[in-house]
Amino acid sequence: MYGSETWALKVGDVQRMMSTERMMVRWMCGVSLKDRRSSLELLDCMGIVCICERMRRCRLSWFGHVERKSCDDWVSKCRDLVVEGARGVGRGRKKWFECVANDMRDLGLRRGDAMDRAVWTGGILGNRPTRACAETRTLKRR
């Protein structure tokens, strides 16, 4: 998913993407809803990682890359940029770092873990037990 590293997705966006993914997987497998096969079963059968998990991995991978950059790099400067001026009325837009912070919390990662590439990659890929893995197992049982 090119560019998904920088998307700040809302819950509705994720649900639409998952719905579309499930529809495409059913079409590829030649399975209809009448066949009463779960989408998770089809994903496991085909060896496909759920699209929301793939986007999470891409987002956290990009965050680790940005964190390891030097402070003088333009990417770090853009990340730490503070925009001055009055903000509009109403709720602000969801920020990319909010998504990353939620992902790190779900996987039990800390911001400092990004400096050690092996720890960071292991946490993203699920090579160590995390809270998100337990939630995934619970979803598969249903």
Language-model region placement:
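Short linear motifs embedded in intrinsically disordered, charge-biased segments
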Residues: 1-142
